[in-house]
Amino acid sequence: MTSVKLDLDAADLRISRGSVPASTQLAEALKAQIIQQRLPRGGRLPSERELIDRSGLSRVTVRAAVGMLQRQGWLVRRQGLGTFVADPVEQELSCGVRTITEVLLSCGVTPQVDVLSHQTGPAPQRISETLGLVEVLCIRRRIRTGDQPLALVTAYLPPGVGPAVEPLLSGSADTETTYAMWERRLGVRIAQATHEIHAAGASPDVADALGLAVGSPVLVVDRTSYTNDGKPLEVVVFHHRPERYQFSVTLPRTLPGSGAGIIEKRDFA
């Protein structure tokens, strides 16, 4: 099978003189081709020689740009075959509730976590109605691979979880999750979770956390987790960079029980 390759004649790889290193400019130009799907996932990057001829840059500069994108997770090197656009992280919803950390580790990706903020305060109305709480502990964490952000994760928790939450606030605890807090440290089993998925424009704080322009499209997932008796435990909101993360679900034609499966909501306003 012939792999898809970037059309260099149509690609904008112009490099300008200025304070931004040429390698960074080339890396950003190639990244733009990936985001715009002119070079789709699984597509092969042009050869080093082709990139040199097209960009007018040196071999060292081209290698630095490609290496930068490899470290950020945009490209993967396959021995004897070339360099290819990396597949996005895929979360299969029909195989049970998994944390983003579990999904990434299953894909061979070791996440890094930045704790951006944590504070107790008034719950937003929707969160208050869901959890039945006036105040919540809000924890904002950024998930990344290398220096490339994947998702902004905002967890709304009961303020009385106490010391059990401390590992979540440690920047070195990259594999810590709210589920680990509930199940391992508090002995509360997660029975099920609802996922509401929609697209939105990045707000200023989301854009800043994910390295995007304000208003850029992001994939938003609202996850509400419940105990066996149907009590809501937490609400976690994920803002994903859409080119780096995707969801997949396999369903039978019919599902037993009310509320089972996927419910489509349309807003034509």
From Swiss-Prot:
Gene Ontology MF terms: DNA binding; DNA-binding transcription factor activity
Residues in HTH gntR-type domain copies: 20-88
Ways its activity is controlled: DNA-binding activity is increased in the presence of L-arabinose and inhibited by the small molecule I-OMe-Tyrphostin.
Record keywords, A-Z: DNA-binding, Stress response, Transcription, Transcription regulation, Virulence
Knocked-out gene: effects: Deletion mutant is compromised for survival upon exposure to oxidative stress and infection in guinea pigs. Deletion of the gene does not affect colony morphology, growth pattern, biofilm formation and sensitivity to isoniazid, rifampicin, levofloxacin and ethambutol. About 200 genes are differentially expressed in the mutant strain in comparison to the wild-type strain.
InterPro entries documented for this protein: Bact_HTH_transcr_reg (IPR050679), Chorismate_lyase_/UTRA_dom_sf (IPR028978), Tscrpt_reg_HTH_GntR (IPR000524), UTRA (IPR011663), WH-like_DNA-bd_sf (IPR036388), WH_DNA-bd_sf (IPR036390)
GO BP terms in the entry: negative regulation of DNA-templated transcription
Induction of synthesis: Binds to its own promoter and probably autoregulates its expression.
Substitution effect: G80D: Decreases binding to DNA
Any Pfam family hit: GntR
CDD domains: WHTH_GntR
Transmembrane segments: none
ATP-binding found in the keyword field: no
PROSITE patterns according to UniProt: HTH_GNTR
Keyword Transcription carried by entry: yes
UniProt-listed SUPFAM superfamilies: Chorismate lyase-like (SSF64288), Winged helix' DNA-binding domain (SSF46785)
Residue ranges the UniProt entry marks as DNA-binding: 48-67
Assembly and oligomerization: Homodimer.
General function of this protein: Transcriptional regulator required for survival in oxidative stress and for establishing infection in host tissues. Regulates the expression of a subset of genes involved in oxidative stress adaptation and virulence, enabling the bacteria to adapt and persist in host tissues.
Domains: entry comment: The N-terminal domain binds DNA and the C-terminal region plays a pivotal role in dimer formation.
The protein, known as: HTH-type transcriptional regulator Rv0792c
Organism from which the protein derives: Mycobacterium tuberculosis (strain ATCC 25618 / H37Rv)
Lineage of the species this protein comes from: Bacteria, Bacillati, Actinomycetota, Actinomycetes, Mycobacteriales
